């Protein structure tokens, strides 16, 4: 009986055929597909993390009442300053407008130069009048020309003459009287020359005016002659006395 059971069990054991290798795939191709799948999974995880990291934009903090008042006051001041400048520009003469334009242009050029120097790390630059250190006559003439060119930008300003008076007084205060007298002579000659030029520019009087005045005087003399006999009568009275 036991032998029959053993025979039956042996018959039931059917050998499982071995799995044939897939000849259509290269060695290691399955491994690459598994690696590729793992990369895609990692990419999806990273995308999810990036989405989680994206923060919603923060709302701007609301201004306090004091900040709003300060902003309004600042706008009022800017508007008042703009109107003041416009009013001043309207009252300016063409010469003053040109001088103001040149002044603003000069300030803009200086600002641009300063920004350029800061960009290249240059802390200071010496040039122009400040860079001049004359030691002979020619160099002093160059300095004089540079100063005149600088001051000529303001010659149409209403305060220019007062500025020159103050400047000359300060410059000559430290000089000996002999030097001051010499400069005074130069200024006197310049004054006479300018006076002649100014008189030459005025229109001359017509000759007819002088003739009329002369004729009038002649007529007046004739009137005085009419009273001459009366004065003679007084002379006869003196003889009688």
From Swiss-Prot:
Compartments it resides in: Cytoplasm
GO CC annotations on file: eukaryotic 43S preinitiation complex; eukaryotic 48S preinitiation complex; eukaryotic translation initiation factor 3 complex
Keyword Metal-binding annotated: no
Domain of life: Eukaryota
Coiled coil segments of this chain: 31-119
Task performed by this protein: Component of the eukaryotic translation initiation factor 3 (eIF-3) complex, which is involved in protein synthesis of a specialized repertoire of mRNAs and, together with other initiation factors, stimulates binding of mRNA and methionyl-tRNAi to the 40S ribosome. The eIF-3 complex specifically targets and initiates translation of a subset of mRNAs involved in cell proliferation.
HAMAP family: eIF3j (MF_03009)
This protein's name: Eukaryotic translation initiation factor 3 subunit J
Organism lineage: Eukaryota, Metazoa, Ecdysozoa, Arthropoda, Hexapoda
């Amino acid at each position: 009986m036991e032998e029959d059971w053993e025979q039956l069990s042996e018959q039931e054991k059917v050998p499982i055929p071995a799995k044939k290798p897939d000849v259509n795939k290269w060695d290691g191709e399955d491994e690459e597909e598994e690696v590729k799948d793992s990369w895609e999974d990692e990419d999806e995880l990273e995308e999810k993390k990036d989405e989680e990291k994206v923060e919603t934009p923060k709302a701007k903090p609301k201004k306090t009442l004091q900040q709003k008042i300060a902003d309004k006051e600042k706008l009022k001041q800017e508007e008042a300053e703009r109107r003041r400048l416009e009013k001043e520009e309207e009252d300016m003469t063409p010469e003053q407008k040109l001088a103001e334009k040149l002044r603003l242009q000069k300030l803009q050029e200086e600002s641009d130069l300063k920004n350029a120097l800061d960009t290249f790390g240059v802390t200071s630059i010496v040039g122009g009048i400040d860079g001049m250190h004359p030691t002979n006559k020619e160099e002093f003439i160059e300095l004089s020309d540079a100063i005149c060119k600088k001051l000529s930008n303001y010659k149409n300003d209403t305060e220019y003459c007062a500025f020159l008076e103050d400047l000359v007084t300060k410059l000559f205060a430290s000089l000996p009287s002999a030097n001051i007298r010499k400069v005074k002579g130069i200024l006197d000659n310049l004054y006479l020359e300018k006076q002649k030029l100014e008189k030459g520019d005025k229109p001359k009087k017509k000759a007819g005016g002088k003739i009329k005045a002369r004729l009038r005087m002649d007529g007046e003399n004739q009137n005085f002659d009419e009273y001459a006999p009366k004065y003679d009568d007084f002379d006869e009275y003196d003889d009688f006395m």
